[in-house]
């Protein structure tokens, strides 16, 4: 417990909580351009080739975004929209790329949870 004199010399500092998605800067989504589209492998118990893209955002940040769903049409210079949301088994991936927005096409033949993958209603 500090003394009164110690508190006068150096007052208590309020600890700031760490932001989970700093690149969004309080926005719900941000637009960006893909600089690299590639696959990477997940952490230990899991095994796969996860599709990710390095994205340069309009505010200058460079982030890694996960491409959800089966199959995608992204390549370098594709314009994409990102949202927050990490991928637990991919270290450093703290954003998701939105499907069916801007240059990203929706997932083909998707019947359930279509809104999450930008898929139109089947006829």
From Swiss-Prot:
InterPro entries linked to this entry: NA-bd_OB-fold, Ribosomal_uS12, Ribosomal_uS12_bac
Coiled coil residues, start to end: none
Quaternary data: Part of the 30S ribosomal subunit. Contacts proteins S8 and S17. May interact with IF1 in the 30S initiation complex.
Alphabetical keyword list: Methylation, Ribonucleoprotein, Ribosomal protein, RNA-binding, rRNA-binding, tRNA-binding
Entry-linked HAMAP family: Ribosomal_uS12_B
The organism's place on the tree of life at top rank: Bacteria
Function of the molecule: With S4 and S5 plays an important role in translational accuracy.
Protein name: Small ribosomal subunit protein uS12
Organism classification: Bacteria, Pseudomonadati, Pseudomonadota, Alphaproteobacteria, Hyphomicrobiales
Family named by the database record: Belongs to the universal ribosomal protein uS12 family.
Cellular component GO terms, alphabetical: small ribosomal subunit
One GO term (biological process): translation
Any GO MF annotation of the entry: rRNA binding
Organism: Nitrobacter hamburgensis (strain DSM 10229 / NCIMB 13809 / X14)
Record PTM 3-methylthioaspartic acid, positions in chain: 89
Pfam families: Ribosom_S12_S23
């Amino acid at each position: 417990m500090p003394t009164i004199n110690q508190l006068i010399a150096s007052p208590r500092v309020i600890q700031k909580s760490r932001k989970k998605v700093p690149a969004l800067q309080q926005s719900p989504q941000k637009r960006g351009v893909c600089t690299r589209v590639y696959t990477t492998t997940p952490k230990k118990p899991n095994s796969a080739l996860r599709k990710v893209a390095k994205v340069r955002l309009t505010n200058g940040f460079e982030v890694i975004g996960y491409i959800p769903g089966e199959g995608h049409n992204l390549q370098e210079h594709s314009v994409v929209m990102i949202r927050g949301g990490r991928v637990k088994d991919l270290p450093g991936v703290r954003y998701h790329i939105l499907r069916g927005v801007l240059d990203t096409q929706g997932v083909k033949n998707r019947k359930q949870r279509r809104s999450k993958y930008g898929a139109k209603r089947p006829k």
